[in-house]
Amino acid sequence: NQSYKRSAIDQYKKTRKKLLMIGGGGSSEKIIREIRDSRGLNSIVVGILDDDGSKVGATIHGVPILGPIEELSEIKIPFDEVIICIPTATNVEMRRIVAICKSTGKSYRTVPTFSELIDGKVSMKSVREVSMVDLLGRKEVELDRTSISQYIYGKKVLVTGAGGSIGSELVRNCLTFDPSLLILLDQSEHNLFNIDRECSQNKHPVSFKPILGDIRDKALLHRVFSSFKPDVVFHAAAYKHVPLQEEHPWEAVFTNIQGTLNLMDASEDYGVDRFVLVSTDKAVNPTNIMGATKRVAEKLIQSKSIDSKVKYMAVRFGNVIGSSGSVIPTFQEQIRNGGPVTITNPKMQRYFMSISEAAQLILQAGAMGSGGEVYVLDMGKPVNIKDIAYELIRLSGLEPEKDISIEYIGSRPGEKLYEELQTNDENILNTNHEKILMMKNENGYNWDHLLIKVDEITSSAKLYDINKVMDSLKTFIPEYEPDYAKDEDWVKKTANKIINN
């Protein structure tokens, strides 16, 4: 009987997954302790690597710290998987660590960043695959929670586009500041259903009200504002897909311009304190309809701020990683289907940040504004789209150009090779947050003159004529340079396609 027990224990030890930890800090300690105290996990930690030389030779719960991370491929102890336990690692550090892990041929996973851990607890359950966010957008955001709390805690907060990529992340972050009411407005039934369900399952006991509706509907907005009287508006609802809006410019005008104006009118009538417009770097020297309409929206809030009790501000930033319809999910789908991965231009670059980072910085910028500011989020360095495609293919365990082919299809209408963060007549000023910059524009806009111009743009949109919409936008936004404005064949072809459909 004793020998049977011994052989069973030996067999159990053999079948346990041998883990090697990267990082000898608190996260490793928690996971080692959890594995030690829980037999159900069927794992054992055999060693730790850490770049802090003073830790080498020490142990954590009996597990030795063996040496620096770069020695991973030389480790003689057998192991099955690497767990990266550095939640504060930057994207640059993560790229280095992942490259070292790949050289071993063994599987590797990571603990989440602290911003992902709502309850702050690291555990084996929270360990996940390395994602593109880790390699591109893993930058921890230092928040002044007191200043954010001052304008959200106990207040009624309306989020438009509440079920979208940015809107839903704003909702999640707002929940942690305990508003008295969260009003979730979205015209997508599917998105609203999802964020409604998520809020109802949230541990934070915050009242919320989902509203299915469109910001184009002025009467609905006045009904919502008169019923709930929001104190704060986060305006994230917008049409954002560049090629689609090139073919349907009137839709961008009705939503991105007229919808914003409708919200502003309701905010004026019902005593909103703070209004934060979610904008885009595509509004800078725009070459596409989406960017031009968002630039008009920025001008609306800048002009209205001159003589309003509402504190209007805009927050401008680049691409968010994983946003619906954006390049990364598209590449991932192409890789799952066996390729090819389609890239518009090998030189194309974009700024990227994670959705959680963008939402947190929007909340922070919202605390700063006194009215009329356009804030720009520091996006770090632009990333080559080709590099992203290659990295995603490698993350899938495949080799670019070998397992998955790359196809260059040429830039689409309205696309720039490089995005910009400021217009020619804007000066960048620092704020008291290292990742938030402020645009100073000396050019004021007369509100009545602005309304006349906006009316001309919306009137042109009602004609459903691409050229007329582009011309009216160009008149108001002189820096708007449609990259195919002189291409009559493209305009005729697109117009015919729309009419025939």
Regions from the PLM with identified roles:
Residues 40-42, 175-181:
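Conserved S-adenosyl-L-methionine
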Residues 56, 94-156, 268:
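Flexible, Lys/Arg-rich cytosolic regulatory linkers and terminal tails that connect or flank
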Residues 142, 147-151, 299, 303-320, ...:
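Strand-loop microenvironment adjacent to phosphate/nucleotide-handling motifs in alpha/beta enzyme folds
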